[in-house]
Regions:
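Acetyl-CoA-dependent GNAT
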Residues: 4-73, 77, 81-94
Length: 96
């Protein structure tokens, strides 16, 4: 299930960042991002486990993917594509 990221997700997302990126975003960057009026964050959750997340920024009529991460053990299963589809749908709704 893809849903909007909530503040309670941040500790797990910060850990996922470290697994997926050599230059990971800090907890404080993630925290400020979910409160930004320009950013939308989604998580891919299955059986109460967060398997991935993504971030889209919509500004001045344009959408830009900022981040997309899938747990290494769950790659090549289509999770990234599903999150990308959710971001595209959001961007279209927002006029980007």
């Amino acid at each position: 299930m893809i849903r909007r990221m909530e503040e309670r997700d941040l500790p797990l997302i910060a850990e996922l960042e470290k697994l997926c990126f050599s230059e990971s975003w800090s907890y404080s960057i993630l925290e400020s991002g979910i409160h930004s009026p320009y950013d939308v964050y989604y998580v891919f959750e299955q059986a109460e486990n967060i398997l991935g997340y993504c971030n889209l920024r919509v500004l001045a009529g344009e959408g830009e993917v900022q981040r997309i991460a899938v747990h290494p053990s769950c790659r090549r299963l289509g999770l990234g594509r599903k999150m990308m589809d959710a971001m595209v749908e959001y961007a279209i709704r927002e006029g980007a």
